[in-house]
Amino acid sequence: MSTRNPQRKRRGGAVNSRQTQKRTRETTSTPEISLEAEPIELVETVGDEIVDLTCESLEPVVVDLTHNDSVVIVEERRRPRRNGRRLRQDHADSCVVSSDDEELSKDKDVYVTTHTPRSTKDEGTTGLRPSGTVSCPICMDGYSEIVQNGRLIVSTECGHVFCSQCLRDSLKNANTCPTCRKKINHKRYHPIYI
C-alpha cells in the first residue's frame, strides 16, 4: 500500500505577488492629466489706469489709492551733474496730501517734508542737533550743558564719546563701553578739549 501524497497546485498564484500587482496596475486605467496650459483672457476696462511700479522712470508717478486723498510729489530726486556729483537744492523735497472733499478748506492741506528747510536749520528752532555737535548718548546733554554743569567730554579707547559723569557711573556697574561693550576700565578713557 503505497500512499502518495498528492501535491496541490495553487492556481492564480499568491494574492499579493508582484505579478498580481503588475496586472492590476496595467488593467486599471488612470485619467490622463493635461499638461497644456489654458490661456486666460484678460479684459481691460477703459476707466482703469494701470501703473507699472517695477520700472524706473525719470518722471515721478502719482498713484491715487483711495479716490479721496492723493499724494502729489513736488520734487522727488536730485538730478546728477556730468561728473556724477549731485546738485544742491535750496528747497526741501516735499509732498502735499490733499483731499477731494469740498468741506475741507485749502488751509487744511498737510505738507509732508523729508528734509528740514535751511531757514529753520540756521535759526536753530528744530529739536535736532546739526551734525558736528557733541552730545552724551546716555544723558543726551549737549556740549554746552555738559560744560555748564562742570563735567568733561571724555572719549573711550574705542572712540565713543560721553560726559565724564555718565561714563564714570556706567563703569561702576560694568567694565564695558556703554555703546559697543568693549572691555574698558577707569584708566582707558581720556578727556577731550574742544
UniProtKB/Swiss-Prot annotation:
GO terms for biological process: cellular response to arsenic-containing substance; cellular response to cytokine stimulus; cellular response to gamma radiation; cellular response to hydroxyurea; cellular response to testosterone stimulus; male gonad development; negative regulation of protein localization to chromatin; positive regulation of DNA-templated transcription. Zn(2+) 1 binds at residues 136, 139, 163, 166. PROSITE patterns: ZF_RING_1, ZF_RING_2. Changing residue 180 to S: Loss of ubiquitination activity. A zinc finger (RING-type) spans 136-181. It catalyses: S-ubiquitinyl-[E2 ubiquitin-conjugating enzyme]-L-cysteine + [acceptor protein]-L-lysine = [E2 ubiquitin-conjugating enzyme]-L-cysteine + N(6)-ubiquitinyl-[acceptor protein]-L-lysine. A motif (SUMO interaction motif 2) lies at residues 50-53. Changing residue 177 to S: Loss of ubiquitination activity. The modification Phosphoserine is found at residues 98-99. Residues 1-12 have a biased composition (Basic residues). GO terms for cellular component: cytoplasm; nucleoplasm; nucleus; PML body. Changing residue 139 to S: Loss of ubiquitination activity. Residues 1-20 are annotated as: Required for ubiquitination activity. Transmembrane segments: none annotated. Residues 6-65 are annotated as: Mediates interaction with TRPS1. The RING-type zinc finger domain is required for the ubiquitination of polysumoylated substrates. This is E3 ubiquitin-protein ligase RNF4. The lineage of its organism: Eukaryota, Metazoa, Chordata, Craniata, Vertebrata.
